[in-house]
Amino acid sequence: MRFIPYGNRRVTRWSDDAHSEVVMDRYEGKRINRPNDVVCKSDGSIWFTDPGLRVPLADKDLPHSGVYSVKPDGTSRLVAEFEYPNGLAFSPDERTLYVANTRHAQYIHAIELDTTGNMVRRRIFADMSSEETDGVPDGMKVDVEGRVYCTGPGGTWVFAPDGAKIGVIRTPEVPANLAFGGPDLKTMFFTARTSVYTLRSKVPGQPHPWYRVRAK
């Protein structure tokens, strides 16, 4: 399955045989603004950010930006409102959802969830404010040991599970997004303005719920 969350004010699911299905395009009867990033949970639910990027104010049906979830039965809910939510990723145990806020207060928020997916607590996980002007908190991934990787000012920032900053991965261009790939999920891919860069990691990325890592 492929999820296309950007550009047409809806989240669309595409299967390998080119069949498409609209996952969500409205909340409480109003058109969502412009979804940005999407992740899936092992229970089959789909979670995405909607910062309303480049939607004229007059065209916005919903006054807020936020994080939404959609259950397999199609039931949707607003998980939390944000100023400008962008990348998001689950912790390995799926008890915490990390969300990057791109503008002004450049924080990664940690949303702690109960077993039903409701927010029980929200806190600041990491501060990505920087004097570097190239790059903002954007794409995000987590590895199997719980480290959080987020593209941002100057490169890809790496945080320990407790929020402590480990360092910054520098690439020739500042990337906007990243992914773990390859048969063992130890190849990191960084997408930037003109190129895609790769780096081998000692630790595999957290697999998607439907992905099985091939052991070596």
Feature map (PLM): residue ranges:
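A short, acidic, flexible beta-alpha connecting loop/helix-capping segment that sits on the rim
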Residues: 173-175, 184, 191-197, 202-205
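Short, conserved, GDST-rich strand-edge loop motifs in beta-rich repeat architectures
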Residues: 3-4, 48-62, 199-202
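Hydrophobic beta-strand positions in blades of beta-propellers and related beta-sheet-rich domains
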Residues: 1, 11, 67, 97, ...
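A detector of repeated loop/turn-to-beta-strand junctions in beta-rich toroidal repeat architectures
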Residues: 8, 62-65, 105-107, 119
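Short loop/turn segments immediately following beta-strands, especially the blade-tip
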Residues: 110-118, 200-208
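Beta-rich, blade/repeat-based domains predominating
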Residues: 1-5, 28-46, 61-66, 78-99, ...
